[in-house]
Amino acid sequence: MGIHGLAKLIADVAPSAIRENDIKSYFGRKVAIDASMSIYQFLIAVRQGAEVLQNEEGETTSHLMGMFYRTIRMVENGIKPVYVFDGKPPQLKSGELAKRTERRSEAEKHLQEAQEAGEEANIEKFSKRLVKVTQQHTDECKKLLMLMGIPYVEAPGEAEASCATLVKAGKVYAAATEDMDCLTFGSPVLMRHLTASEAKKLPIQEFHLNRVLQDLGLTWEQFVDLCILLGCDYCESIRGIGPKRAVELIKQHKTIEEIIQHIDTKKYPLPENWLHKEAQKLFLEPDVINPDDVELKWTEPNEEELVQFMCGEKQFNEERIRNGVKRLSKSRQGSTQGRLDDFFKVTGSITSAKRKEPETKGSAKKKAKTNSATAKFKKGK
C-alpha cells in the first residue's frame, strides 16, 4: 500500500516538489529500483488476455519478459539500473500481509463467479488481484539480471528503505518505486512510472523530499508522523482524520504524541494497541544495507548463458533474445560517456546495518568489505 493518499496530497499542497520528465532526460543516471514492485508490475501487465505468459511446462514467464525488455529500454536511454530486492518483512507488516491474503482469497471467489458467468472483463480484473510475487519469480529475476550484467543487491528488510539509503549516500540519483513510503524512509528523490509500460505513455514523476518538507513546513520526523496519520503498512491510522486534517494537526501539535493529548478521542477514537511509536522507529531507523560497503559494476551481458536460460529453459524465441542482447551491448557501449559523476566501480558485497548518515562524501567511496556475505552481485561466467 505504501502511504495512503500521499501522492495526491503532495500534488495538492506541495506541487513544486513534483517534476515530470521523459525517460531520455535520465541519461547517465544511476537509479535504485524496487525489484519486487517491478516484478509485481510485470506479472500484472505482461499478459495474453487474462492469463500470464507461460512456457510449455506451465511455468510463468511474464516477469522474465518484463524484466528483460524494460531493463533494456532503460539502458538504451542511458540509465544504469540497480535492482534492490526485499529481505525479511518487518514484524509490524504482518497485519498488512494478512489483509492482502484476505483480499486475494476474496478475489479468488469473485474470479470463480466471473468464470462461471463468462464475464471476460471481471475475469481479467480478478485474475490480476491474485498476483503474488513468489521466491521462484525473485530467484529467476536475479539470475536474469546477473546474466544481463545488471547489478542487484539484497536488502536485509524493506527494499524501499535500502533504496532510500543508496540515494542518501550518493550511490544513485534516485529510488524508483510506486510505493510512496520510500519518501518516508528519507529518499531525497523518488521516481514513479520508470518501469511502466511504454504503451501507457506515462511521464516519469520525480518527488523531491526537501521541497515537500519546505512547502509543508515540516521536519522529516514530523513528515514521518504525517505519513503514519495518512495510513501506512505498519500500523492503523486514526479513523476520521483525512489528509488535510492530518497536515493541520501535525503543523499545530508537531508530533503524534501531542496530537493524542489534544484531539477529542470520542470523535476520533485511537486504534486499539496502536503501534505508532514502533512505526516511527521503523521509518527513522530501518534495517538497511550499509552504503559504505556497496560498490556496483555494470558488466557485459553473457549472451550464450542468457540464450540457454531464456530459450533453453524458459522457451523464449532465440532470435528475439539475441537481438535484445545486441541492443543491450550496443547501449552499454554508448552510455559510457555519461554524466561525469555517474560511473560504476568494482563489485562488492552488501552488509545489513541500521541506517546512518554518511559522514563525508568520501565515505561513500570506500572499497567494499570482502568479508561481508549478506548479498553479492556476481559476474556471469
From Swiss-Prot:
A Pfam family matched in the record: XPG_N
Residues the entry annotates as binding DNA: 47, 70, 158, 231, 233
Residues binding Mg(2+) 2: 179, 181, 233
Cofactor descriptive note: Binds 2 magnesium ions per subunit. They probably participate in the reaction catalyzed by the enzyme. May bind an additional third magnesium ion after substrate binding.
InterPro entries in alphabetical order: 5-3_exonuclease, 5-3_exonuclease_C_sf, Flap_endonuc, HhH2, PIN-like_dom_sf, XPG-I_dom, XPG/Rad2, XPG_CS
Region of interest (N-domain), residue spans: 1-104
Renumbered residue ranges of the record's region Interaction with PCNA: 336-344
Region called I-domain, residue ranges: 122-253
Record note on modification: Phosphorylated. Phosphorylation upon DNA damage induces relocalization to the nuclear plasma.
Required cofactor(s): Mg(2+)
Keywords annotated in UniProt: DNA damage, DNA repair, DNA replication, Endonuclease, Exonuclease, Hydrolase, Magnesium, Metal-binding, Mitochondrion, Nuclease, Nucleus, Phosphoprotein
PROSITE patterns named in the record: XPG_1 (PS00841), XPG_2 (PS00842)
Binding site for Mg(2+) 1: 34, 86, 158, 160
Enzyme class (EC, first level): hydrolase
GO CC terms of this entry: chromosome, telomeric region; mitochondrion; nucleolus; nucleoplasm; nucleus; protein-containing complex
Subcellular location: Nucleus, Nucleolus; Nucleus, Nucleoplasm; Mitochondrion
Biological process, per Gene Ontology: base-excision repair; DNA replication, removal of RNA primer; positive regulation of sister chromatid cohesion
Comp. bias intervals (Basic and acidic residues): 96-113
Sequence segments annotated as region (Disordered): 96-118, 351-381
Described function: Structure-specific nuclease with 5'-flap endonuclease and 5'-3' exonuclease activities involved in DNA replication and repair. During DNA replication, cleaves the 5'-overhanging flap structure that is generated by displacement synthesis when DNA polymerase encounters the 5'-end of a downstream Okazaki fragment. It enters the flap from the 5'-end and then tracks to cleave the flap base, leaving a nick for ligation. Also involved in the long patch base excision repair (LP-BER) pathway, by cleaving within the apurinic/apyrimidinic (AP) site-terminated flap.
Family membership: Belongs to the XPG/RAD2 endonuclease family. FEN1 subfamily.
Subunit and partners: Interacts with PCNA. Three molecules of FEN1 bind to one PCNA trimer with each molecule binding to one PCNA monomer. PCNA stimulates the nuclease activity without altering cleavage specificity.
Name of the protein: Flap endonuclease 1
Organism taxonomic ancestry: Eukaryota, Metazoa, Chordata, Craniata, Vertebrata
